[in-house]
């Protein structure tokens, strides 16, 4: 089950479309969907988590806590809406595209993809692009 929680004024326009897409992303990686909680927040909220739990005194767009057991992926994914907005501007993409990238990024970590080395980051970016292309909204 995929849940969206809001600790900021932001909210998704079409939660069901995002839920369907993220479920398809999980299936495409041959994993089973456990409980995945997305928590949308601001920089201050996520910075506190980064310092308290990871001992990193920096701003970030996403922090994920992985509770995956075996093939069933579960966890809490915190997303700073402010960072996503700034990154979208920096990368010259729409807010929605950058948001999709971040949402997929969290799932891909749970599927075992890393991004610390250049090679791993390149594979992660490729997988993000592949998963973003899977998103569609029925018109």
Swiss-Prot record:
Subcellular location: Cytoplasm
Presence of keyword rRNA-binding: no
GO CC list: cytoplasm
Enzyme class: hydrolase
Keywords (A to Z) from UniProt: Cytoplasm, Endonuclease, Hydrolase, Metal-binding, Nuclease, Ribosome biogenesis, rRNA processing, Zinc
Cited InterPro entries: MetalPrtase_cat_dom_sf_prd, YbeY
EC assignment: 3.1.-.-
Positions of Zn(2+) binding: 105, 109, 115
Superkingdom of origin: Bacteria
A molecular function GO annotation: zinc ion binding
Known cofactor(s): Zn(2+)
Gene3D superfamilies tied to this protein: Metalloproteases ('zincins'), catalytic domain
UniProt-listed Pfam families: YbeY
Details of cofactor binding: Binds 1 zinc ion.
Biological processes per GO annotation: rRNA processing
NCBIfam families: rRNA maturation RNase YbeY
Membership in a protein family: Belongs to the endoribonuclease YbeY family.
Function: Single strand-specific metallo-endoribonuclease involved in late-stage 70S ribosome quality control and in maturation of the 3' terminus of the 16S rRNA.
Protein name, per record: Endoribonuclease YbeY
């Amino acid at each position: 089950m995929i849940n969206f929680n809001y600790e900021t004024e932001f909210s998704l326009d079409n939660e069901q479309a995002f839920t369907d897409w993220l479920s398809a992303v999980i299936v495409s990686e041959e994993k089973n969907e456990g409980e995945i909680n997305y928590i949308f927040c601001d920089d201050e909220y996520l910075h506190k988590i980064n310092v308290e739990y990871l001992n990193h005194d920096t701003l970030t767009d996403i922090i994920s806590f992985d509770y995956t057991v075996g093939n069933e992926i579960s966890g809490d994914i915190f997303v700073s809406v402010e960072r996503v907005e700034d990154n979208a501007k920096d990368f010259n993409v729409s807010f929605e595209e950058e948001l999709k990238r971040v949402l997929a990024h969290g799932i891909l970590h749970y599927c075992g993809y890393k991004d610390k080395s250049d090679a791993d980051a390149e594979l992660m970016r490729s997988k993000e692009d592949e998963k973003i292309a899977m998103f569609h909204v029925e018109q």
